[in-house]
Amino acid sequence: MGKYFGTDGVRGVANQELTPELAFKLGRYGGYVLAHNKGEKHPRVLVGRDTRVSGEMLESALIAGLISIGAEVMRLGIISTPGVAYLTRDMGAELGVMISASHNPVADNGIKFFGSDGFKLSDEQENEIEALLDQENPELPRPVGNDIVHYSDYFEGAQKYLSYLKSTVDVNFEGLKIVLDGANGSTSSLAPFLFGDLEADTETIGCSPDGYNINEKCGSTHPEKLAEKVVETESDFGLAFDGDGDRIIAVDENGQIVDGDQIMFIIGQEMHKNQELNNDMIVSTVMSNLGFYKALEQEGIKSNKTKVGDRYVVEEMRRGNYNLGGEQSGHIVMMDYNTTGDGLLTGIQLASVIKMTGKSLSELAGQMKKYPQSLINVRVTDKYRVEENVDVKEVMTKVEVEMNGEGRILVRPSGTEPLVRVMVEAATDEDAERFAQQIADVVQDKMGLDK
């Protein structure tokens, strides 16, 4: 990660860390690095945003920066992040930009770029933009007079994206009753339209954005109300998206959460059965549940683990030409259809499996036994030394012997804080908590910041 770019673009508190001034520079310098210096005099750039109140302010500044470098900007309005990624590629744009802080609270916002291929930027491209941001007054082109171009609104882009999504399934959803939670974000109008167009009977919550209520006690990070609504309305299942629509979490007919691991398993199992799963492989992160890997093994499906973060999942998928991957948190990437995590796409693919198999979501998800998980964070002096600490290794080995293959241990440094994360999965909740505490106590004793 650089000075400005994190694992998912540039983020910060809107108008404090992510200011209009910074948004202007990101538009100008990002537009130059990713579009203008390819030799295009007026490169086409698509700009979308979520429902945050700060979105319009940052959008105006960003577009001004892009136009100042000579870009022809098409404003998509409120749309999901994967919608921007798809349209950038489909419409032959040089660059796509999304203004969103995903599942973060309303005070935050972010700016992320997509190249002409629809993929997020490489580290090298981000470093090039950062180098310009740190210069006093970089000498870049400034078109004048007739060389300054208008920007245009292309709000029809959302409909084009939804039509594409609809074309990826071969069935309609007549007879399915589905509750949709739009997190008061980008999918608030997109999801009901898409599922309604596919003839599902839909109920909605979290689909009334007012600029301030995005992700507030709703969406994929807060599926409790969705679970209540599914049971109350006797629906077949529910789907919760996050603020920018790149994540999804499901709820079965009994109000039980079905997470990203289970969704990947259900879709992967169907793809494998139909010989559509490239190299019989699903890419996940080290945080996926042990039950996920055991269920895949029983189906004859291979798995490949990456570091935590959907960008690492996508990198591995591209490297190995794999077409399904994702995270427990609900970022699911289906590379046959889009270049990034796509909640709406995943949702209709999941609904398609439910419709075609005639099985309930609880029945499909129940094929994967989730192991109870316990996570303890320990504040430490040097998080990176945990992997070489002899005492920590010793207690981990001891616990592994005691678990006898019915569990998993993951001890890793946090990517953003001075913490070591101790995660243990075991046969019972009690075992998971006991083993995690056992390891965390040693980490605290030998490396703890607060000891």
Swiss-Prot record:
Cofactor note: Binds 1 Mg(2+) ion per subunit.
Protein name: Phosphoglucosamine mutase
Pfam families: PGM_PMM_I (PF02878), PGM_PMM_II (PF02879), PGM_PMM_III (PF02880), PGM_PMM_IV (PF00408)
Keyword set, alphabetical order: Isomerase, Magnesium, Metal-binding, Phosphoprotein
SUPFAM superfamilies according to UniProt: Phosphoglucomutase, C-terminal domain (SSF55957), Phosphoglucomutase, first 3 domains (SSF53738)
UniProt cofactor(s): Mg(2+)
GO biological process, one term: carbohydrate metabolic process
Entry-linked PROSITE patterns: PGM_PMM
GO CC, one annotated term: cytosol
